[in-house]
Amino acid sequence: MARQEQANDVFALTSFLYGGNADYIEELYAKYEDDPNSVDPQWRDFFAKLGDNADDVKKNAEGASWTRKNWPIAANGELISALDGNWAEVEKHVTDKLKGKAAKGEAKGATGAALTSEEITQAARDSVRAIMMIRAYRMRGHLHANLDPLGLSEKPNDYNELEPENYGFTPADYNRKIFIDNVLGLEYATVPEMLDILKRTYCGTIGVEFMHISDPAEKAWIQERIEGPDKKVAFTPEGKKAILSKLIEAEGFEQFIDVKYKGTKRFGLDGGESLIPALEQIVKRGGAMGVKEIIFGMAHRGRLNVLSQVMGKPHRAIFHEFKGGSYAPDDVEGSGDVKYHLGASSDREFDGNKVHLSLTANPSHLEIVNPVVMGKARAKQDLLAGRTRDDMVPLATRAKVLPLLLHGDAAFAGQGVVAECLGLSGLKGHRVAGTLHFIINNQIGFTTNPAFSRSSPYPSDVAKMIEAPIFHVNGDDPEAVVFAAKVATEFRMTFHKPVVIDMFCYRRFGHNEGDEPSFTQPLMYKAIRAHKTTVQLYSDKLIAEGLIKQEEIDQMKAQWRENLETEFDAGQSYKPNKADWLDGAWAGLRTADNADEQRRGKTAVPMKTLKEIGKKLVEVPKDFHVHRTIQRFLDNRAKMMETGEGIDWATAESLAFGSLVAEGSPIRLSGQDVERGTFSQRHTVLYDQETQNRYIPLNNIQKGQAIYEAINSMLSEEAVLGYEYGYSLSDPRALVLWEAQFGDFANGAQVVFDQFISSGERKWLRMSGLVCLLPHGYEGQGPEHSSARLERWLQMCAEDNMQVANVTTPANYFHILRRQMKRDFRKPLIMMTPKSLLRHKRAVSTLNELSGESSFHRLLWDDAQYNKDEGIKLQKDAKIRRVVLCSGKVYYDLYEEREKRGIDDVYLLRVEQLYPFPAKALINELSRFRHAEMVWCQEEPKNMGAWSFIDPYLEWVLAHIDAKHQRVRYAGRPAAASPATGLMSKHLAQLAAFLEDALGN
């Protein structure tokens, strides 16, 4: 018992050291170090006994160099009240103000005399209650807004939370003026005056969610923009007519296509026509606030309407596509895509402000275009800042390019890539100064009701995690929709942060025009059939206002239809005049042809230049404290540069990067942990061990060089890869690389590989030079750390769509990276990259192999053929009994095993580039060994790796050279369900077995 009491005493004496007080104690300690007399004597004694270094104490108090400044935000009265209902601060603030007013004679009681202290207390209580009621409307008003055009959604149980009675006001108080300190733009207001503003602002056809935002400036801006007696949604007569005109265009276009192409899929905008005037407003207001370019990404719903009414794509071109015509000239090859996937670009001008618009081509996989659009926007923003920029481009510069994403309600709530993109929005390497998200919320996903497609009240709720403001709006009130679009655009341009518009509307017909929605939504479609269109409702409103007559509206509709008829006739003979895919940033590039040797590019770098770059790679500023292991790494690299020997993988990569930035090609390397490299091999970003400041040797190669950026990405594959692909679409003169942490994880982004990287050029005439670095190799690390699934990339290869390589030397890696920039066309490159080879004594190159006339080799010879100091000397070609062909790391396993066994009549030939397949080069090499047995050896199981892909090619080559053995024999792991074993003993047994199969008698 005594021991228990003793422990309690110790606890009582030291409880102030509880972790939650740490920040406070550190600040106090720093204060003590500055001036011991500035703290309480007890604290003085406590700190004196610690005897810490004064500088360390101050550093601790300041916190880490990477911490966010002014964060967390100091809790204000309103924030406290939100969390714990403590309104005392607010009451004190109001009481002080009222006392001040009473002293100046500005506040009087009911009799006209100065306020007594009781009256001040009562007035302060009234003020606090009124502010509590106002706050309730800000927090919960959106739940009571009139958002559903069909009126089908159930009203939430509000528990009287918005009723004045809930805050202590009875009808007897309604005529009393209450001090509200300009909270609603009024200093004093009666309860009915407050309710009038609050209901109009928060419970009309717009519902705003913004109280989840922690930045007081952003919250105050929204309040100031929408609250107040003069903040009604108001448009001039011209503005209203312009809205009506765009609605008539949107509705008329859909109806016209419905008549002309009955039953053809168009994924119409019927029921959501307010989108079109809203987009016009975004373009117009954005242009006035400095936007130079808007990049759209959207799904199929309403796409043709956006293309024609917003992007200005000629209607005749769309009608030409409806009758089965191609969107590209006849001389452009490509497999094409359906109408509602195609992109477009145009220039629009409002009030003298030119804005370039582009709509990104996309697949049917919903929301996957989002990161692509963001990546494109980032690249355009970087181009505005210039190739020699540093890595901190001002957000005001970035804001000139606006990514605008249109979503469906079910997809926004359902697709994980949406949350991934929101996660990217604030990151230094991926931010785009705010994306504008517009949800076309037709309250259904194909045939699924919202109750079954999301667990939250709104589809937009996922956006709350990044504190984006959300404007819910009724699509049958076009003025409210346009107003919401205007405020959202202004918020983005002011704060450079994402913002969401959630437009409640409906889908007048089925998911597509051949669909019958009443099977699954009978009540909804009964209501829709009885519901007037948005054009009818808005026309009725303007007629009632006396702004326009029915005859004028009929005339507007007739003129629009006449215009569409003219375009329809022109569409019958329409011919696309040129493909736009090599315009702008792509000017000077061409389509690749199949001629073999022209594809190498001049990739060698003069020896002198390599040495100069190498010197810069190992230099750090004098006062920079390098980690001792990193210093060793730099010293080793300096030695390599001095001798020109032993160039390892990471050094070859840095030399390739250094030479490219020196030549003016920016480099963007992104992925998980790429600064250091998963295997601690890269270290292109160095950290000072004292200050944590960064130093990047590759950005200090020479004056006027292009930028090198290594971006440690968030832990996502899908959104990050989509983003980097988008970046590569906008800037063909930047080398863009994405590295998977292990190649095994690349399939987390499979949609991007399937829908964009492998097929984008054939479907949409869009080239990309993106490089994917996928660590691959069997080293006994188990099924998720061994295989980048080489077979999958090869299965996608056809029509010269991309390159797949599995190189074995640093020199070849150097050349293949430079080759991406040194040709006048662009192709994606899928690279199997090494793990154990990063430090393998044989996997090294010389500087000579990077300079002079050297270049990339698609096939590499047996090292024993040319290196005289190797352990074995090969027989002459005629005496070689077997040729073992292989690709990647397994070459070194075979080489060492052959040396161990003293075999001199087996030749090892490496296929470094698997696609495009080097057939001619292979014919030349294998002609030397016509009588030898041919073996394909791989470390992957038989149903994986390159075997299934390469077997028919090799058979064709053997037939072509009239080889003695017309079939290639397989040596490798047997077929397996899992890519690799997790047991080291089993891994080694499998390795020994297939090496015996490949090299044994």
Swiss-Prot record:
InterPro entries: 2-oxogl_dehyd_N, 2oxoglutarate_DH_E1, 2oxoglutarate_DH_E1_bac, DH_E1, KGD_C_sf, ODO-1/KGD_C, THDP-binding, Transketolase-like_Pyr-bd
SUPFAM superfamilies for this protein: Thiamin diphosphate-binding fold (THDP-binding)
UniProt-listed Enzyme Commission number(s): 1.2.4.2
BP GO annotations: glycolytic process; tricarboxylic acid cycle
Record bears the keyword Oxidoreductase: yes
Catalytic activity reported: N(6)-[(R)-lipoyl]-L-lysyl-[protein] + 2-oxoglutarate + H(+) = N(6)-[(R)-S(8)-succinyldihydrolipoyl]-L-lysyl-[protein] + CO2
Superkingdom field: Bacteria
CDD domains linked to this entry: TPP_E1_OGDC_like
Pfam families reported in the protein's UniProt record: 2-oxogl_dehyd_N (PF16078), E1_dh (PF00676), OxoGdeHyase_C (PF16870), Transket_pyr (PF02779)
GO cellular component, one term: oxoglutarate dehydrogenase complex
A molecular function (GO) term: oxoglutarate dehydrogenase (succinyl-transferring) activity
Cofactor: thiamine diphosphate
Keyword Oxidoreductase: yes
Swiss-Prot/TrEMBL keywords: Glycolysis, Oxidoreductase, Thiamine pyrophosphate
Cross-referenced NCBIfam families: 2oxo_dh_E1, PRK09404.1, PRK12270.1
Primary role: E1 component of the 2-oxoglutarate dehydrogenase (OGDH) complex which catalyzes the decarboxylation of 2-oxoglutarate, the first step in the conversion of 2-oxoglutarate to succinyl-CoA and CO(2).
HAMAP family tied to this protein: SucA_OdhA (MF_01169)
Summary of subunit composition and partner proteins: Homodimer. Part of the 2-oxoglutarate dehydrogenase (OGDH) complex composed of E1 (2-oxoglutarate dehydrogenase), E2 (dihydrolipoamide succinyltransferase) and E3 (dihydrolipoamide dehydrogenase); the complex contains multiple copies of the three enzymatic components (E1, E2 and E3).
Family: Belongs to the alpha-ketoglutarate dehydrogenase family.
Name this polypeptide is given: 2-oxoglutarate dehydrogenase E1 component
